[in-house]
Amino acid sequence: YDKSLGGGILNDAGCYPINASRMLFDSEPRGVFCNLTIDKETQVDTKATLLMDFNDNIKSQFSVGYDLDYQSNYGLWGSDGSLSLTRSYNIPPDMPARLNIKNSNIDEEILIEPVNHFQLMVESFCNEIMKPNSCIYNFEEDLLNQAKIMEACRISDKEKRYVETREIE
């Protein structure tokens, strides 16, 4: 690992569940608490544990690490049941994803047909260039909001405290 290259687990893998939480809850977090494990030799963050606090008492928490078994799973738990998705990222284009839905009456697994998600991302990006504002996302606003949360994570780890996203300009 090389700190001068700007990597680290927060940038390399933590960005995905941060973005997914924002998408799933269709809102921005009010604040974060982040704990990074820094490699003593390289000074690069190799593990991250993060709690994001959204409105309406909604929370998102996750852990990522270079030396952890690869899982890439999501779980959502609510008062009426739960959803879980296996192999959410970096899924081979021929592998189906599995969505599990559970509550007191249902225990169902839905196979999601394989798709090349990298191809879909590139196509969406190219389509936005060719036909501006054709995508449901405002890419510029989304990137700025994501950067704000990532910065709040870094400050939270450095200062060992909960950081409200409104603190970040």
Show the residue positions of the predicted features:
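Mid-domain beta-loop-alpha active-site segment that forms a flexible
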Residues: 1-28, 142
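Short glycine/proline- and charge-enriched loop/turn segments
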Residues: 1-4, 101-107
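A short glycine-threonine-serine/GTX helix/turn-capping micro-motif
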Residues: 4-11, 108-116
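Soluble or luminal CAZymes and related metallo-dependent hydrolases
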Residues: 13, 117, 145
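Alpha-helical packing segments of well-folded alpha/beta enzyme cores
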Residues: 17, 121, 146-150
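Contiguous beta-strand/loop segments that form the cofactor/metal-binding neighborhood of enzyme cores
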Residues: 17-92, 112, 122-134, 168-169
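C-terminal helix-rich "cap/oligomerization" subdomain common to oxidoreductases
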Residues: 55, 109-110, 126-169
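Short polybasic amphipathic segments
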Residues: 74, 92-104
